[in-house]
């Protein structure tokens, strides 16, 4: 793998003369501020074969840490008696695909960050210790086949009958599949109470891959000419790398373009990764995707518990999740069979990690798509200058959606000079008049204000302290009703001390 991998190792290894060894040397990336890998001997007790991307527990100074295997070699800068042995091999197989592994090596070199910390960032919190990757997963199977007697029993319970038919047709389903299909927990419990369905615990690797949709969704909307051109152009390279900047005005139907492209990938059994800039956008995005597609959709962002993030990570890695939606950290989500990466609102600065391992999720998404050999779509109504320059340099392909989709019309804008006006609670006479006119016609009015909250920040005048979010280091905004501090970046809420 002579590429950024070897280049990184050459740069990170000490300049001492190397010593040939008769046995195997394992190079491990340790989560430390040192920009290098560390040499170890294989475990004293024979274990599984060690491959790059597997976690190992190793002695490091006076403590033991969990690192990631980078490569094996026949030489080291240390004498054999100075090398320590790996304590435990924690995984049966690499946690990263070859493409994702190479993306992380590239990121460490490009962003000049210690390789061990890069690998740690890419892993869920629970996997940064000795937590096993494989977790037991709950699945449900039919105990009694759906025959005439059972159909009669469930004649008045149509929801129960259709859920039973679903489980029987797929042999076994997990809770995500049941939820995504629109069935409640109560319906499932009623089937179990009647001894028609039983719950089983199985290892996560036995959970079946998602079932590709057999036909287009009934919710699919007709495309205008510009949308058709965008979809047709992107589908030409649906099996190989290409980067597209989907430049569309607000309301131009970028999401519908995403949906139809994803539909094509799912029909071919391939997974899709969708990145959104903020946690606040995730629920509405997930809701639209789950309503549109019957395939499992998982979510990955910092607001989830460690256990929930590991579960989503596992489903994505094993291929049981068809679509993974998340914020910037989801760019590291493992995909069993990747088909497409989408970065919505690619211009948003929230895609940039500002502390620790500093990276741009948008740029990493492009590089990862290149390593995975899949298309990547960057969507925006106000594209970043970097992306526009890449289009000029023919690195990206520029697709424009210049008109609003459907029957939507561009708004009529009116600029009101309030410098000489008397305002009422901050509103001009013209605004109040036109607002009342719409209300009298039973229409709705949406008023945007230039600031959310009572005050933009909470600060101490004596020492200059500013209240910051413990989750993402953004400034907290003061809200009066209800009183509290809120992070407009990640959604964290804290009490307002008096």
Where are these regions (language model features)?
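Short amphipathic alpha-helical segment that frequently serves as the phosphate-/nucleotide-binding helix
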Residues: 43, 362, 428-432, 466
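Cys/His-rich short segments
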Residues: 431-432, 440-498
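C-terminal boundary of histidine-terminating zinc-finger modules
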Residues: 415-428
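A polyampholytic, Gly/Pro-enriched intrinsically disordered region
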Residues: 317-324, 421-424, 495-497
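Short, charged/small-residue-rich alpha-helical element at the C-terminal edge
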Residues: 249, 432-433
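Accessory, non-ATPase domains that flank or precede helicase/AAA+ motor cores in DNA-metabolism machines
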Residues: 1-380, 387, 392-408, 439-440, ...
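Conserved coupling segment at the C-terminus of the helicase ATP-binding
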Residues: 382-383, 468
């Amino acid at each position: 793998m002579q590429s950024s991998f070897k280049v990184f190792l050459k740069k990170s290894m000490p300049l001492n003369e190397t010593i040939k060894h008769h046995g195997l040397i394992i190079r491990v990336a340790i989560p430390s501020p040192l920009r290098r890998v560390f040499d170890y001997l294989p475990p004293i007790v024979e274990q599984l074969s060690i491959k790059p991307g597997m976690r190992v527990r190793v002695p490091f100074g006076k403590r033991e840490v969990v690192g990631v295997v980078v490569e094996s070699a026949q030489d080291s800068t240390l004498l054999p008696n100075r090398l320590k042995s790996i304590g435990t091999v924690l995984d049966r197989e690499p946690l990263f695909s070859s493409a994702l592994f190479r993306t992380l090596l590239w990121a460490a070199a490009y962003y000049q960050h210690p390789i061990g910390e890069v690998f740690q960032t890419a892993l869920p919190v629970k996997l940064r210790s000795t937590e096993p990757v494989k977790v037991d997963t709950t699945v449900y199977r039919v105990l009694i086949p759906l025959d005439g007697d059972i159909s009669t029993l469930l004649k008045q319970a149509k929801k129960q009958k259709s859920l039973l038919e679903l489980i029987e047709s797929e042999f076994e389903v997990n809770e995500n599949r049941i939820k995504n299909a629109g069935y409640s927990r109560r319906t499932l419990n009623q089937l179990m109470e009647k001894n028609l369905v039983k719950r089983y615990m199985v290892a996560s690797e036995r959970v079946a891959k998602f079932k590709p949709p057999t036909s287009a969704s009934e919710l699919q909307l007709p495309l205008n000419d510009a949308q058709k051109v965008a979809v047709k152009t992107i589908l030409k390279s649906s099996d190989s790398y290409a980067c597209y900047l989907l430049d569309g005005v607000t309301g131009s139907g970028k999401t519908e373009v995403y949906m139809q492209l994803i539909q094509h990938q799912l029909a071919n059994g391939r997974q899709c990764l969708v990145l959104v800039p903020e946690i606040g956008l995730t629920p509405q995005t997930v809701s639209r995707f789950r309503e549109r597609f019957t395939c499992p959709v998982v979510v990955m962002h910092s607001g989830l518990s460690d256990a929930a993030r590991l579960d989503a990570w596992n489903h994505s890695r094993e291929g049981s999740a068809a679509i993974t939606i998340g914020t910037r950290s989801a760019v590291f989500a493992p995909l069993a069979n990747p088909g497409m990466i989408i970065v919505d609102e690619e211009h948003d600065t929230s895609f940039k990690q500002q502390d620790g391992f500093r990276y741009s999720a948008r740029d990493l998404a492009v590089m990862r798509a290149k390593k995975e050999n899949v298309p990547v779509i960057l969507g925006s109504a106000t594209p970043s200058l970097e992306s526009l320059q890449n289009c000029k340099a023919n690195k990206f392909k520029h697709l424009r959606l210049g008109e609003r989709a459907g029957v939507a019309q561009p708004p009529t804008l009116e600029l009101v000079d309030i410098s000489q006006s008397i305002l009422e609670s901050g509103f001009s006479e013209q605004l109040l008049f036109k607002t009342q006119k719409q209300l009298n016609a039973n229409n709705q009015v949406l008023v945007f204000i230039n600031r959310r909250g009572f005050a933009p920040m909470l600060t101490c005048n004596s020492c200059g302290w500013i209240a910051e979010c413990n989750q993402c280091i953004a400034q907290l905004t003061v809200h009066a009703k209800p009183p509290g501090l809120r992070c407009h970046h990640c959604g964290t809420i804290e009490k307002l001390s008096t």
